[in-house]
Amino acid sequence: MSYRVTGDAARKARERYELKQAAAEFYRKRNVPERLEEALNSTFCLGPEDVYGHLANYFAQFSMPPTICQIRGRKVLDGSGEPTVEVEVSCTVKNSDKRICSSVISAVSEHPKASEGLEQERNHSADTAIQWLKDLSPLLKGMSPNEQHNIDQLLSDFYQPKIEEEKARRQMEREASPMAIEPVPSPVTSPALGKKKGSGKGKKAVVMEKPIPPKEAPEPVVPGSPAIGALSLAVAKASSVLGKTPLYLHIATLRNEKLPSEFIMPTPMISVLSCGKSSPGKLNLMKEVLVIPPTGLTVQQSLDMALMLQNQIVKQINSISKTGPAIKNVTPLGCMLIGGDRIEQPLDLICEACQHVGLELGRNLYLAINCAAHELMDYNKAKYEALSGTFKSPDEMVDLYVDLINRQPAILALLDPLRKEDAAQWESLTKALGSKCFLFADAASKPVCKLLESADIHNPPCSGTVIKHTNETTVSQLLGSFKLIEGENRVTILGCPCEESVDDSIADLAVGLGARFVKLGGLLRGERSSKYNRLLAIEDELTQAGTLGFWTKHEFPILSDVENLPGPEEVE
């Protein structure tokens, strides 16, 4: 019996010894004794009030880097009340699973907003996006949020079969249903003023007008695609949160090999009026009238100036109203919707407002016009309807813009003055006005992914392209598009779509990417003003850090791909 007791005791002693040895080896491999000794010595020397807090901070630097543990998606509403998807990223941090951040981006449809079935389409896209996120969650599990480019490549690889499936599905639908053949507009004929040679007396000559290029088919939007862009942004935000650095600094480190010593805030293009197709008057040409501050102003000064001008415009509209204060109709772009019967009517209104508040157009502020020409084309007449009942050919539109800029030199930029298909007229317009104002392509430009695939930013020939973070666009693709545009001596603009979400990350993206301009809309909607507020916060941080810089001039780029283009001009 005593032998058995002795044997059990020896076995237990041996097990305890082996356990102690295993524990010692476990900690030795991880250098715990040395680091513990160092931590205790430094804590004693420093004598911090919060001893455990100091020890926690010391050991935190040796913890394993956070890794993604879960991706979740939920359906939310954007600023216009339309369904979209929010992406939430959770990470394993110091052995605990924690929710880190979320992001929402705009879901842009390939169909007009008024099209039937849009609500069902948006709901289907959001539901599909949520399912995609469930599929992506195990693929990203264990990856570090710092692996932005690797994760974006994984997302692009995941998305590519989806777009091929969507193309195949659409092809099958076309083959299964009768083809709807759109009538091709025939060349429009117009009577000449002179008599036709060799014809009977009094007969007028008939002039054949050039047919316009047909409308290009819109790029297919794959249901669920917002999951890709939103997840890419959420990963970038997670990396910045875990690294305890603002998102704009994180984006800047992705863009540059080293952090720049100075940050220049993008110049805001602020929408104040809308006189487009949806406005009550005859004028269709000005979907947005925007103000652009001169260089040298802070974002705060620019917004104060725009707000003062906007309030004065409201006073003027109320003063001429016969029924009391006019109802302030606000578009989804965040600006006032007014009617106009003449092309210069909204410009005259702004000019009068500037005089009342002591601003000089062309010196204290400039104007920009979003023409949205693709919305003005009447394909039956093969002409643009700049004013209701007034139709102009693409060549006549070029003459209209040249005359307008000559009479209104304070106009610094035109956005989408023509359809992207009217390449010859874009070239003519660039030759005529390229040294006087910026000509930007918004809807006339390619989506970011197609822009990178083709590496062609010369069609249409323009001063710059409005880049938007929507649908399947990843952060890496945004970085690539900015590099491409700047490499071709073009101006970079980061913009919001018409239906915008409440996420204010676009402000950080604009600063981190080094955008020359940022187009966020007007000041009259919450989802727009929140982005301006984020710009103000970033500007304040840069001011406190002493790293805020300023643009010195508005300089129009030299477009080498347009022959005989005049040299660049500069304005303050």
Curated annotation (Swiss-Prot):
InterPro entries according to UniProt: DD_ENO4, Enolase, Enolase-like_C_sf, Enolase-like_N, Enolase_C, Enolase_N
Enzyme class: lyase
Entry superkingdom: Eukaryota
Any one GO MF annotation of this record: phosphopyruvate hydratase activity
Active-site residues, Swiss-Prot/TrEMBL: 468
Biased composition (Basic residues): 194-204
Pathway the protein acts in: Carbohydrate degradation; glycolysis; pyruvate from D-glyceraldehyde 3-phosphate: step 4/5
EC number: 4.2.1.11
Region called Disordered, residue ranges: 181-204
Protein's GO biological process: glycolytic process
Catalytic activity: (2R)-2-phosphoglycerate = phosphoenolpyruvate + H2O
One Pfam assignment: Enolase_C
Gene3D superfamilies: Enolase-like C-terminal domain, Enolase-like, N-terminal domain
Keywords assigned by UniProt, alphabetized: Glycolysis, Lyase
Family under the similarity heading: Belongs to the enolase family.
Protein name per Swiss-Prot or TrEMBL: Enolase 4
Source organism per UniProt: Xenopus laevis
